[in-house]
């Protein structure tokens, strides 16, 4: 009986040990499967994250290039506009320099000579130009100056003059600003070709 108990104990130990080893093998196998699944998922997630990061980096690069191109275009446009503005200022200054009293006198006399003799006209000038030119124009235009032609001072004109039909809507603008604007519009297409940067 003692052998039977011993055999029984040995059998229980052996069965328990076998069961424990079987259970341990299953646990290890399950752990290996879980570990492999975790590794596969981690690798898959890593690939997905890498692809997403590469995609975002590519999009960022494209957006950066587009932003850079736009910045360059804006810079070119701003530079062209600044150069045009400087050109326009220089043109206005040059035209204003030409508009001295002698030039104004000659221009007014020519315009008055070709204007219809029966029309009454007003010549609108800067206040200082009126006082400087009045006596010279009296000599050249004669008796028409008070009757058919009247000189009118106007603070809004810096250089040059305007001629207007009295009691009419027709007028011609010979101010330095207007002449410079007309010249600028005429020269602008050629000027654009000169400063064309891109």
Swiss-Prot record:
One molecular function GO term is: proton-transporting ATP synthase activity, rotational mechanism
- DNA-binding among the record's keywords? no
Q: Which residues form a coiled coil?
A: none
> What keywords are assigned to this protein?
ATP synthesis, Hydrogen ion transport, Ion transport, Transport
InterPro entries attached here?
ATPase_V1_Esu
A single Gene Ontology biological process assigned to it is: proton motive force-driven plasma membrane ATP synthesis
Q: Transmembrane region positions?
A: none
Instruction: State the GO CC annotations.
Output: proton-transporting two-sector ATPase complex, catalytic domain
The highest taxon in the source lineage is: Bacteria
> NCBIfam families, from UniProt?
PRK01558.1 (NF002424)
Q: What does this protein do?
A: Produces ATP from ADP in the presence of a proton gradient across the membrane.
Family from the record: Belongs to the V-ATPase E subunit family.
The entry's protein name is V-type proton ATPase subunit E
């Amino acid at each position: 009986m003692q052998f039977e108990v011993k055999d029984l104990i040995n059998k229980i130990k052996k069965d328990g040990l076998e069961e424990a080893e079987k259970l341990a093998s299953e646990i290890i196998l399950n752990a290996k499967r879980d570990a492999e699944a975790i590794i596969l998922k981690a690798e898959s997630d890593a690939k997905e994250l890498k692809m997403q990061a590469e995609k975002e980096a590519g999009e960022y690069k494209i957006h950066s290039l587009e932003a850079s191109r736009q910045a360059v275009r804006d810079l070119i446009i701003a530079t062209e506009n600044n150069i045009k503005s400087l050109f326009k200022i220089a043109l206005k200054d040059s035209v204003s320099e030409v508009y001295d009293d002698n030039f104004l006198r000659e221009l007014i006399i020519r315009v008055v000579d070709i204007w219809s003799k029966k029309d009454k006209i007003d010549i609108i000038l800067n206040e200082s130009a009126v006082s400087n030119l009045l006596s010279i124009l009296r000599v050249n235009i004669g008796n028409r100056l008070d009757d058919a032609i009247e000189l009118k001072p106007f603070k809004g004109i810096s250089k040059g003059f305007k001629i207007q039909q009295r009691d009419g809507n027709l007028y011609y603008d010979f101010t330095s600003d207007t002449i410079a604007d007309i010249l600028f519009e005429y020269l602008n297409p050629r000027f654009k070709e000169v400063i064309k940067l891109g």
